[in-house]
């Protein structure tokens, strides 16, 4: 079986491509990092260096030709950027690829969306898939919601292709280039001090990346799923952010650090000033109001639909995920013991 994995050179896509190869599948992988792409070739993947946002409809059809599944992980998930760029990468490119999949008769198209579409600067518990923020928190959330709407439209046009959307929350694990690297940079910049609103007491649903890969496999194999269905995916273990960071940074990586509680209103105001300066200087701010709020407000997701329809249960607990992430980071030189 041949599977197309987009965004395969880092993060979730890299985990997905590696798992598929180890499971004996043929993998066609896309991404913009040619060095990481060469590593995928060494593992046995067919790698195509391609920016999907720039790809023509014909190139998209060539990508999906002879593929039974498409796992669409590619996205712009930066906390900062222009509206047009987010929509070009996250919405328009997704629509092009989804249309190509429909035209070429791909059996399953699994799209990685985001719970950011729920976020509205308030605490929430046990949110189900039907909730929407009245106003999206940033361009990223708005563009990912637009991508979902375009997939629903393709599902009506191409009924022979089943389009499934997954919303994993708070991804961490091997090949992450965003969350943990930024934490390590902050620790180095602030000399071992990690400043968080409320001292990191937010209760969050987080997800170990290989568990999302498991959910993607279930979404591809499970019979009878309605096209256009969407599922929350988490580790089923909501945890205080400070506890997760202590387990990873101190216990696994052996880093000495001090967690400093900063009042949320102060950080929110500071982030707003940084955003204003970033707009004038055209440089990404160190903080955004969204990135501050995301680690301040509690957010947990309902898992009933994923359990009942996908049969999803995490393969790795939070404890196992943190341990495996620590092992990977140590191999990459991401921490020093002692």
Locate predicted features.
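N-terminal Rossmann NAD(P)H-binding glycine-rich loop of SDR-like oxidoreductase domains
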Residues: 3-23
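Conserved Rossmann-fold NAD(P)-dependent oxidoreductase catalytic core, especially the SDR/UDP-sugar
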Residues: 96-139
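Substrate-positioning beta->alpha
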Residues: 177-182, 198-220, 228-229
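Conserved C-terminal active-site "lid" loop/helix of NAD(P)H-dependent oxidoreductases
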Residues: 209, 270-313
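Mid/C-terminal beta-alpha module of Rossmann-like enzyme folds, strongest
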Residues: 219-286, 323-326
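Amphipathic terminal alpha-helices
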Residues: 301-309, 313-338
């Amino acid at each position: 079986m041949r599977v197309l994995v987009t965004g395969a050179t880092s993060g979730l896509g890299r985990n997905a491509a590696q798992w598929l190869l180890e499971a004996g599948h043929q993998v066609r992988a896309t991404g913009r990092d040619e060095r990481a792409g060469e590593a995928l070739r060494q593992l046995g993947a067919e790698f195509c260096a391609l920016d999907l946002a720039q790809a023509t409809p014909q190139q998209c059809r060539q990508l999906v030709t002879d593929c039974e599944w498409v796992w669409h992980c590619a996205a712009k998930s930066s906390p900062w950027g222009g509206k047009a760029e987010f929509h070009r990468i996250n919405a328009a490119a997704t629509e092009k690829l989804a249309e190509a999949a429909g035209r070429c008769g791909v059996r399953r198209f699994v799209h990685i969306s985001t719970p950011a579409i729920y976020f509205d600067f308030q605490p929430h518990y046990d949110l189900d898939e039907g909730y929407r923020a009245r106003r999206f928190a940033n361009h990223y959330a708005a563009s990912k919601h637009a991508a979902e709407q375009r997939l629903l439209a393709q599902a009506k046009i191409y009924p022979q292709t089943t389009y499934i959307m997954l919303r994993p929350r708070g991804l961490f694990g091997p090949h992450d280039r965003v969350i943990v690297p930024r934490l390590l940079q902050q620790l180095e910049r602030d000399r071992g001090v990690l400043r968080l609103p409320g001292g990191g007491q937010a209760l969050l649903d987080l997800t170990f990346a290989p568990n999302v890969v498991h959910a993607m496999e279930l979404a591809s194999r499970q019979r009878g799923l309605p096209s256009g269905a969407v599922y929350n995916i988490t580790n089923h273990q909501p945890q205080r952010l400070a506890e997760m960071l202590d387990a990873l940074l101190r216990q696994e990586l052996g880093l000495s650090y001090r967690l400093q509680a900063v009042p949320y209103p102060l950080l929110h105001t500071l982030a707003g000033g940084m955003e204003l300066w970033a707009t004038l200087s055209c440089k990404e701010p160190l903080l955004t109001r969204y990135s501050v709020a995301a680690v301040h407000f509690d957010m947990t997701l309902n898992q009933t639909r994923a359990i009942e329809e996908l049969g999803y249960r995490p393969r790795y607990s939070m404890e196992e995920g943190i341990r495996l992430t620590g092992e990977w980071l140590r191999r990459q030189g991401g921490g020093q013991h002692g």
